[in-house]
Amino acid sequence: MTEKERILKKIESDTSRPVLFSESRGGSENQLRLLFKYVPDEFFKGINLILNNANPNLLEKDKINVLWMQHFVNQEEAKNLGSKEFVDQLDYIIFNSHWNFEKFQYQFKIPENKSIVIRNAVEKIEHHEKPNDKINLIYHTTPWRGLENLLNIFKKMNLKNVELNVCSSTEIYGKKFSEKYDQKYKSIFDECKNSNNINYLGYLDNPKIIELLKKMHIYSFPSIWPETSCISAI
């Protein structure tokens, strides 16, 4: 078993996580996949890499305990960072932005000497000429980040030469998550499907999103969510 396989096996078996890693294509999970793509396996030897879960049961005494925290400070999986006993057992805490680190330090007095910021990244997207027959807008993140607000604004504008493409679904976090939360946002998705000049595309995987972005003019994202390092905007 490689070091990366060992880490992934543990994350996959962590039942306290709200999503199953293998099914999820969320930002945090994709950042780990990107890290594993470019960093050699040998660099993870002796490392217990914990993803977004300040759960004391995930600590290992014989390894270097590294918590990679991409969640905002108010999330359930982050609360144990308020425990000095837990933080003392961590060797390093990685945050995805200086802003996010500052919020945790303010809330929980996280020690600076254990804190590292590694900002989020995406694969390079080459510049493409955009179509000029109409203006294409896109919303390509989860519904609770501002989709309802966007729909209200877009419908009131009622512009004939503008189309809104909505790529949003609870499916991004996998079957386990979708079965629990999809019904909550069904009315918003139905509104997208039944509105003029709105193309509801549901869940699209990352390569398809990137291809679609090449034709888009504006990322329409009236966010109501505390983004820690917004990958969809990057």
Predicted regions and their residues:
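Nucleotide-activated donor-binding/catalytic signature segment of Leloir-type glycosyltransferases, i.e.
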Residues: 178-207
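Active-site proximal beta-strand in glycosyltransferases
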Residues: 47-77, 91-95, 116-118
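Short acidic alpha-helix that forms the nucleotide-activated donor recognition element
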Residues: 205-216
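Short alpha-helical segment that forms part of, or immediately flanks, the ligand-binding pocket
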Residues: 210, 228, 233-234
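Carbohydrate-associated surface elements
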Residues: 99, 121
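Acidic donor-binding loop of glycosyltransferase active sites
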Residues: 214-228
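N-terminal pre-catalytic "stem/leader" segment of glycosyltransferase-like enzymes
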Residues: 1-58
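Conserved donor-binding/catalytic core segment of Leloir-type glycosyltransferases
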Residues: 129-146, 151-154, 165
